[in-house]
Regions:
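Transmembrane helices of ABC transporter permease
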Residues: 60-70, 175-229, 300-313, 330
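Juxtamembrane helix-loop junctions of ABC transporter transmembrane domains
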Residues: 35-43, 66-67, 74-83, 87, ...
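Membrane-integrated ABC transporters
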Residues: 1-76, 90-104, 119-123, 127, ...
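An intracellular "coupling" helix at the cytosolic face of ABC transporter transmembrane type-1 domains
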Residues: 55-59, 147-148, 164-173, 177, ...
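ABC-type nucleotide-binding domain
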Residues: 364, 371-633
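Transmembrane helix-loop-helix hairpins at lipid-water interfaces of multipass membrane proteins
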Residues: 59-115, 195-200, 298, 302, ...
C-alpha cells in the first residue's frame, strides 16, 4: 500500500499522462490583455472630449462606481456605530450594546478594507486600459498625419503629447477619478445624515459651503490657464532637449555648450515660473479649504455643546456629528486636490485633442482605387505647390513626363524645388494646383497604402530603427526570407560589410543605426528599398554619404537594379546624373533644362557650366570638393 501510494505521488508530481498533456496543450494561452477594441481606436477620427472618452467605458466604470458607492455607505456607518456605543453602551451602562457596536464597527472596517482593495484594483486596471486605448488612438493618428505636420511640429513636442500629457490623464483616471466619486458620494451621504440627526447643527456645519463653492469657481478659471501654460512649457523643454541631444556633435564641434546651456536654462526657468504659478493657485485653494473645515468644526462644537448642555442633543450624537464633519471636509479637501489633478489632465487632454483634430494633409479618398502593380509611368501636369504660410511657390506650373523604366536625375541649386518634386511623386504632399499621375491615374484617386507599396524610397539622411540589420532591411516586407534579405544586401554591395559585424545580419544597430557608419546605414537603406521589389525607385541621392570606393560600387548596383524600374534620383553629384538616362535641371520651382547628359553638356546652360566646373576641380586634384561645391543642390 505504501509503495503504491508513493508511486501515485511520483506520478502526480512528475510528467502528466499523454492524454492529459494533449488536453493541456489544446487549452488557450492565459493572456492578461486589456479589453480594448484596437480596430475601433485605430479608425477613430477627430478631437477627443473627456466626456465622450469616458462614455465608451461606462460598463467597467459602472462596476467601479458600485464599489465606490459601497465605500461611501460603509464610511457613513462608522460614526453611527460610535454614537450607539457611547449613548447606549457607555452612557446607558449597557456592556452588551457596547460590545455589539464594537463588533459591528470591526465588521464594517473589514468589509471596507476589502472594498477599497477591490476598488483600487478594478479602477487601476480600467484606467490603464483606457490609457492604452488612448495611446493606440494617438499613435495610429500620428502615423496618418502628413509630412507637413512633422515639418511644423518639433519632435519633442510630439513626444510630450504621447508621454507627459497622457501621464496627467493616468493620474486622473487611476486615482483622481475614484477619489472624486468617493468624495462626491461621501459629501452627499454625510449631508443627508447630518440633517437627519439635527437640522440646526447641520446648517452650522454646512454654512461654509457657499464660500467654498465660490472659491472653487474662481480656482477653476485661474487654474485652467495656469496648467495650459505649464503644459506648453514642458513641451518646450522636451523639444529643446531632444534637439540638443540629436545635435550634440555639432554643439561640441563648434564649442557651443555654454550657449546651449544658457538657452536650456532660459526655457527651464520659464517652465519653473509656469509650475510655480500653478502651484501657488493650488496652495491658496487647498489652504482655504483647510481653513473652512476648521471653521465648520468650531461651529459644530460651539452649537453642539450648547445643545448638549440644554439636553437637546446626546453626547454620542455630538461625537458622531464631529466625526461626520471631519469626514465631510476630508473628501472636500480631497476633491480640491482631485480638481487640481483634473485641471492638469484637462490641459493635457486639450493638447492631445489638438493633435487628434489635425487632419492628414494626404489621405485616400473614399472609394480610392487599389493598384496591384504599376507600369511605372509618372507625370506632373501643370503642378504648382506652395507650402503653408510661404510667400512664394515652391513649384510653379511644372509639366514633366517620365516613361516606365526610365532613370531620371533631378539636379539644381539648393531650394530649387527638387525635394518638393520628389515628395509629390511619393505623395507625401498633394499639389496646390495640377495633377501628379501614375500610369495616367491621379495619385489622389489611388489608395495611398497600395500606391506607396509600389515605391522604394531612400532619403538622403539614412534612418534605421533600433533593431537587427535583417529586421531593418525587411522592414517593408516583414515576411521576407533570409535568402531574400541577403540578396538585397548583395545587390547594393553591403553583404560583406554586414557579415563582418558582430552577429552579422542579427547585429542590433541601435537607435537611428548609431552603431554603423554613415555609409553602412545608407547601404542598409538601399537594400531595404530594393527588397520590396518596387515599380518606382525614388532616391534622394542615395550615394551622397558614401566614400568614393563605395560610391562606385553602389552606383553599379543601382544601375543594375533600376533596370525595368522607373527611377528618379535627386543628384547632388553630377557624376550620378551622368549615369542616368535623362537629366532635368530645376531652378526656382520650374524645369529649366531637360535632356540626356550628353545633350545638356553641350547646351550652354546651367548644367554645362556646372559640369565644366566639376571637371576643372577634378583636374586640379580636388575631385570630392569640386563635385560637392558645384553640384550639390
Amino acid at each position: 500500500g505504501g509503495g503504491g501510494s508513493g508511486g501515485g505521488w511520483v506520478a502526480l508530481l512528475g510528467a502528466p499522462p499523454p492524454a492529459m498533456a494533449a488536453r493541456i496543450a489544446q487549452l488557450p494561452p492565459v493572456r492578461d490583455e486589456p479589453p480594448v477594441d484596437e480596430a475601433r481606436e485605430v479608425q477613430a477620427r477627430g478631437a477627443l472630449r473627456l466626456r465622450d472618452f469616458v462614455r465608451q467605458w461606462r460598463g467597467p466604470l459602472a462596476i467601479g462606481l458600485a464599489l465606490v458607492g459601497l465605500d461611501a455607505l460603509l464610511g457613513l456607518a462608522g460614526p453611527l456605530l460610535v454614537r450607539s456605543g457611547i449613548d447606549d453602551g457607555v452612557v446607558g451602562h449597557d456592556g452588551l450594546a457596547l460590545l455589539g457596536a464594537s463588533l459591528a464597527f470591526l465588521a464594517v472596517t473589514l468589509v471596507a478594507w476589502w472594498d477599497q482593495w477591490a476598488e483600487t484594483i478594478w479602477t487601476g486596471r480600467t484606467g490603464e486600459s483606457m490609457l492604452y486605448a488612448l495611446r493606440v488612438r494617438l499613435f495610429a493618428h500620428l502615423q496618418r498625419l502628413g509630412m507637413d505636420f512633422y515639418e511644423r511640429e518639433p519632435a519633442g513636442r510630439i513626444v510630450t503629447r504621447m508621454t507627459s500629457d497622457i501621464q496627467t490623464l493616468s493620474q486622473l483616471l487611476q486615482n483622481g477619478l475614484v477619489s472624486a466619486l468617493v468624495g462626491v458620494a461621501s459629501v452627499l451621504g454625510i449631508a443627508a445624515v447630518l440633517f437627519a440627526l439635527n437640522v440646526r447643527l447641520a446648517l452650522a456645519a454646512l454654512a461654509v459651503l457657499p464660500v467654498l463653492g465660490a472659491a472653487t469657481v474662481g480656482y477653476r478659471l485661474v487654474a485652467a490657464r495656469a496648467y495650459d501654460r505649464q503644459r506648453e512649457q514642458v513641451a518646450a523643454v522636451n523639444a529643446h532637449l531632444q534637439e540638443s541631444v540629436a545635435g550634440v556633435k555639432v554643439v561640441q564641434a563648434l564649442g557651443r555648450e555654454q550657449a546651449g546651456l544658457e538657452t536650456f536654462q532660459e526655457i527651464g526657468l520659464a517652465y519653473r515660473r509656469a509650475s510655480l504659478t500653478a502651484l501657488g493657485v493650488q496652495a491658496l485653494y487647498v489652504a482655504l479649504a483647510d481653513l473652512l473645515a476648521t471653521v465648520a468644526t468650531v461651529a459644530v462644537l460651539w452649537v453642539g455643546g450648547d445643545l448638549v448642555r440644554s439636553h437637546a442633543l446626546a453626547v454620542g450624537a455630538l461625537v458622531a456629528f464631529l466625526l461626520y464633519v471631519t469626514q465631510l471636509f476630508a473628501p472636500v479637501q480631497q476633491l480640491a486636490q482631485t480638481y487640481d489633478t483634473y485641471q492638469r489632465a484637462l490641459a493635457g487632454l486639450r493638447k492631445i485633442s489638438g493633435v487628434l483634430a489635425e487632419e492628414p494633409s494626404v489621405a485616400s479618398r473614399p472609394g480610392a482605387q487599389r493598384v496591384a502593380r504599376l507600369r511605372g509611368e509618372l507625370a506632373l501636369a501643370g503642378v504648382s505647390f506652395r507650402y503653408p504660410g510661404a510667400s512664394r511657390l515652391a513649384l510653379a506650373e511644372v509639366d514633366l513626363e517620365i516613361a516606365a523604366g526610365q532613370r531620371l536625375a533631378l539636379v539644381g541649386e539648393t531650394g530649387a524645388g527638387k525635394s518638393t518634386l520628389l515628395k509629390l511623386l511619393a505623395r507625401f504632399l498633394d499639389p496646390t494646383e495640377g495633377r501628379v499621375l501614375a500610369d495616367g491615374m491621379d495619385l489622389r484617386d489611388l489608395d495611398l497604402q497600395s500606391y506607396r507599396a509600389q515605391l522604394g524610397f531612400v532619403p538622403q539622411e539614412p534612418f534605421l530603427f533600433s533593431a537587427t540589420i535583417r529586421e531593418n532591411i525587411a522592414f517593408g516586407r516583414p515576411g521576407a526570407s533570409r535568402a531574400d534579405v541577403e540578396a538585397a544586401a548583395r545587390a547594393v554591395g553591403a553583404h560583406e560589410a554586414i557579415e563582418a559585424l558582430p552577429g552579422g545580419y542579427e547585429h542590433v544597430v541601435g537607435e537611428r543605426g548609431r552603431s554603423l557608419s554613415a555609409g553602412e546605414r545608407q547601404l542598409v537603406c538601399l537594400a531595404r528599398a530594393l527588397l520590396v521589389d518596387p515599380a518606382v525607385l525614388l532616391l534622394d541621392e542615395a550615394t551622397a554619404n558614401l566614400d568614393p570606393a563605395l560610391d562606385a560600387q553602389v552606383q553599379a548596383a543601382i544601375t543594375a537594379v533600376a533596370t525595368g524600374r522607373t527611377t528618379v534620383v535627386i543628384a547632388h553629384r553630377l557624376s550620378t546624373a551622368e549615369q542616368m538616362d535623362r537629366v532635368v535641371v530645376v531652378a526656382s520651382g520650374r524645369v529649366l533644362e531637360d535632356g540626356t547628359h550628353a545633350e545638356l553638356v553641350g547646351a550652354g546652360g546651367w548644367y554645362q557650366r556646372s559640369w565644366e566646373a566639376t571637371r576643372a576641380a577634378l583636374a586640379a586634384g580636388s575631385a570630392g570638393a569640386g563635385d560637392a561645391a558645384t553640384a550639390v543642390g
